[in-house]
Each structure stands twice: as C-alpha cells, then as structure tokens.
Amino acid sequence: MGDFFMNGLIFILSLLWTAGAFASGVNIAPDLASIVVTHQGAKVLIERNQNPENLVNPAYAKTSRECPPFCIQPIKIAPGVESIGELELLDYLKAKEQGDSSVLVIDSRTPNWVERGTIPGSINIPWTKLSPSAGADPFELAEIFAQRFGAIEQEGFWNYAEAKT
C-alpha cells in the first residue's frame, strides 16, 4: 500500500510540475500576458502564440523580395509623426478599450492584406486612401482627416491639435 501511495504521489506531483511549466505561458512582456479588445463588436484576446515550437506563417516568412514594393521603410515616416512599438500600440488599444475617445488605431493595410489579418480593435483605412502620391482623392482625404481623425481645416492647412491620437 505504501508503494502505491508513493507512486501515486510522485505521479501527481509530476503532473503539477508539468502543468506549472506550461502555466507560465509565453507572455507579451514580463508583466503582460494578454489584453482583451473589442473588434467589430466582438471581444478579442490578444496574446502571443503559447506554443514555443510555433513557426511564422510561410506567407510572411519571405526575406528577399523585389523592392519596390517590398522596400525597407524608415522608423520615422515623416516629421511630426510619432513612431511607436508593439507595447505602445497595446497601450493605445487598452486605452481605447477603456473608453478613451481620443484614441484611434488605424490598420492601414490594403484590403487584400486585411483579409489575411488585421489589428484587433483597429479600423481599416488603406494607406492608398491616405497618400496623395498613391492616388488618394484629396476630397476623400479631407473627409477622413475631418471625420475620422478630428482634424480641423483652417485656411488650407490642417490643425491636428485636437485630433485623435
């Protein structure tokens, strides 16, 4: 009876140790495992894939593609435009989820890319609608600036002082 009990105890402890090893998870940051945002009316959990053996989707794995269009881009896209990293983006998504109406997160990928995935909690405004050099209609661009961003046109210039972040 003692051996049976001891073997059972060892088995249970090994299960608990294994469960504990998996429970630690693959966090986003040391103090951030995940966040929940609302996307198109549904709650979405943002977290890293918990499988440490996971590989990048082959559709995103190419490292050598013709430039243009697949050119390396600067981290600072234009003067006055703030560049942020993934953790800062998650902070903005959390603020938006908590009701901060000054935050607007835009996924600027084109529709064919958005079909493959998007930023949960964002709205899609393709970069082609935001860039005059890509053929964006100036009137549609002005409408986006005013209605989506909250910018104010003043004597031919745009005032972003009260625009969404």
Regions found by a protein language model. Give the residues of each.
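Short, charged, surface-exposed secondary-structure boundary motifs
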Residues: 132-142
